Amino acid sequence: MILTNQLISIMKTLMGLAGLTMAGFMLLSCNTEVKEANYQIIPLPQEISVMDQAAPFILSNGTKIMYPEGNEKMQKNAEFLASYIKDLTGKSLAVQAGTDGKGIILQLGGNAENPEGYQLKVTSDQVVISGPTEAGVFYGIQTLRKSIPVAQGVDIALPAVEINDYPRFSYRGAMLDVSRHFFPVDSVK
């Protein structure tokens, strides 16, 4: 009788531990992982001011990319950014005309003197990429793209920052070392 009571007590303890272990695994599997963007990219932008105390912008499936209505070049920029984000994170972001609201906003203007300069400002509600020309906004998109980590199935935290950048030289060049690193034709185009 005593042996049976001890056996029942041990069984209850083991069942309780198994239940707690399963509950722990269930809680961990529901946890949403967030990866953080890194603004230390090449080429390094001219000015980077990170706001350490401010909340980051969370790039998730519900994020929208907005551009000025009626501007086809900016629409192409927005679609280009959406395709890059999909390749990097697997997230399909909606692209829509307009520049009001929460999300990633592409706009013309800003205080960049160079036509290829841009300003990238990240707050908890918005990522605003502005430039005096569509080319400037395009280069701002490149900075944002390089900052986003390759991470499928997780949200991306973009730390609050203000980046002002412009080309140091009047020309842009690139070299493809295809003898050691082969590139598909689509990526070269």
Regions from the PLM with identified roles:
Residues M1-Q40:
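Bacterial Sec-dependent N-terminal signal peptides
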Residues I2, G70, R180-H181:
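A generic structural signal for short
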Residues C30-F169:
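Acidic, contiguous N-terminal accessory segments
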Residues A160-K189:
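An acidic-aromatic substrate-binding cleft motif
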